[in-house]
Amino acid sequence: MKFFAKMTATCLGLGFFPLAPGTLTSAFVVLLYKFFLFRLSWPFYLLIFVFLFLLGTYASTIYSKSQKKEDPRSAVIDEAAGQLLALFLINPTWILCTSSFVLFRFFDIVKPFPIKQVEDFPKGFGIMLDDVVAALFAGILLNLYLLLK
């Protein structure tokens, strides 16, 4: 079970990349979206997100306990789920995918209120939820821009 949690939490090892593993994972999700995932119906896309969130919460709880850290740097399933949500219903052009990526990474790294506070939720739920809130910030901001331009 620990091996499954480790592979899930680290997105099959992407989390072990020495430089910016969260950014690498987000970039990988952008490429998956750009070339494949945008074709999914929105209910199925959201179902995948919910499944990834629940699986990530479970795996992150086990993995963080095994690493004896609250939020191990190598646990990047939260970035995968967050980036997936930030891309929801976005037209898969390079400019919009890149904008979603930059906004999500900004909010995930800077963690303005209330994102930082959400991290304090227990175990894997806190690991996952701050990225979901960062994704909501990114998605809302990008969609507001698109509505107002």
Give residue ranges: language-model regions.
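Interhelical loop and helix-boundary elements at the membrane-water interface
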Residues: 1-25, 58-86, 106-136
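Alpha-helical transmembrane segments and their cytosolic membrane-interface
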Residues: 14-21, 42-45, 143
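Hydrophobic alpha-helical transmembrane segments
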Residues: 24-28, 43-50, 94, 98-102, ...
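Interfacial segments of multi-pass membrane proteins
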Residues: 28-41, 84-90, 142
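Short alpha-helix boundary/capping motifs
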Residues: 36, 91-92, 113, 146
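Membrane interface segments of multi-pass transport proteins and intramembrane proteases
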Residues: 36-50, 114-125
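Alpha-helical transmembrane segments and their juxtamembrane interface "caps"
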Residues: 38, 42-56, 61, 73-77, ...
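Juxtamembrane boundary at the C-terminal end of a transmembrane helix
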Residues: 143-149
